[in-house]
Amino acid sequence: MQQQIGIFEAIVLGFVQGITEYFPISSTAHLRVVPALLGWADPGTAYSAVIQLGSLLAVLTYFYKDLVEILSGTVRALRTGDTQSREVRLFWGIILGTIPIVIAGLALKSTLEAPGSPLRALSVIAVASIVMAALLWLSESLGKRTRTMKGIRVIDGILIGCAQALALVPGVSRSGSTLTAALFLGFQRADGARFSFLLAIPAIFLSGLLELKVLVDEGFSGGIGPIVAGFVSSTVFSYLAIAWLLKFLQTRSTLVFVIYRFFFGALLLGLLAAGLLPDIEPVRQALNLP
């Protein structure tokens, strides 16, 4: 069921979505946690997925030239028979890399959207944030960072796509899991992030389109205004986040995000243990939280 959301709340949630979708810190987690901290209702998976379409518009705009090159290069390769061109490898890497999250998403859809789903519990988000922080740190420590987009293989896309499927669990982070996988595979940070963002396009599109249908069927019970406000806010801040992060990763490591994720997860666990944040009832009882 769609929650009632005001214009101001929508703009704030769009800002949160835009900044956190492409930073490796989990947009879904922050869209769940920020409302809880501010005393707002959980916007739900449908609204969250629809404002992700703003993030989709941003990445399509930012990578417009890349996408044109990939598509035109693939069409050209079909004519010439050059199946090993960079554009063809990127194309199939993105297409095949999207399959794991589609399969997992369909399998878990009812669980993720069920009222009081344990997967949307704040305690789950906290643990996922800490675990992914550790994995991101390991990928920074062990990754060789010698590979670029020029040498990407289709199998790289599939492996990174499998990592993307983990992001269905709030707190994992789509960009976090895919960037971590890319670093483990030896990619340079900025190149890993670029492929991560390109790989996100089909997944965000399919997810947002599916949930948009849900909101249309419900007749926009929360009003069209908050949806538009959240979409515009998400678009603007997503574009800024993409541009900033790619420039940042050219010279810096992801350590700042590792530290943030550790503290974010630890803070959540502390607030839950102190009874200052409510968790989903079955999880709260299982963990004996106040």
Swiss-Prot record:
Catalytic reaction equation(s): di-trans,octa-cis-undecaprenyl diphosphate + H2O = di-trans,octa-cis-undecaprenyl phosphate + phosphate + H(+)
Presence of the UniProt keyword Membrane in the record: yes
E.C. designation(s): 3.6.1.27
Membrane-crossing residue ranges in chain numbering: 5-25, 44-64, 88-108, 122-142, 152-172, 195-215, 226-246, 255-275
Compartments where located: Cell inner membrane
Entry keyword annotation includes Hydrolase: yes
Entry's Gene Ontology cellular component terms: plasma membrane
Topology of the protein relative to the lipid bilayer: Multi-pass membrane protein
Example GO molecular function: undecaprenyl-diphosphatase activity
Keywords associated with the record: Antibiotic resistance, Cell inner membrane, Cell membrane, Cell shape, Cell wall biogenesis/degradation, Hydrolase, Membrane, Peptidoglycan synthesis, Transmembrane, Transmembrane helix
InterPro entries: UppP
Pfam families the UniProt entry points to: BacA
Enzyme class: hydrolase
GO biological process: cell wall organization; peptidoglycan biosynthetic process; peptidoglycan metabolic process; regulation of cell shape; response to antibiotic
Extra remark: Bacitracin is thought to be involved in the inhibition of peptidoglycan synthesis by sequestering undecaprenyl diphosphate, thereby reducing the pool of lipid carrier available.
Alphabetical list of HAMAP family matching this protein: Undec_diphosphatase
Function field: Catalyzes the dephosphorylation of undecaprenyl diphosphate (UPP). Confers resistance to bacitracin.
Family membership noted in the UniProt record: Belongs to the UppP family.
Official protein name in the record: Undecaprenyl-diphosphatase
Annotated organism of origin: Gloeobacter violaceus (strain ATCC 29082 / PCC 7421)
Lineage: Bacteria, Bacillati, Cyanobacteriota, Cyanophyceae, Gloeobacterales
Gene this protein is translated from: uppP
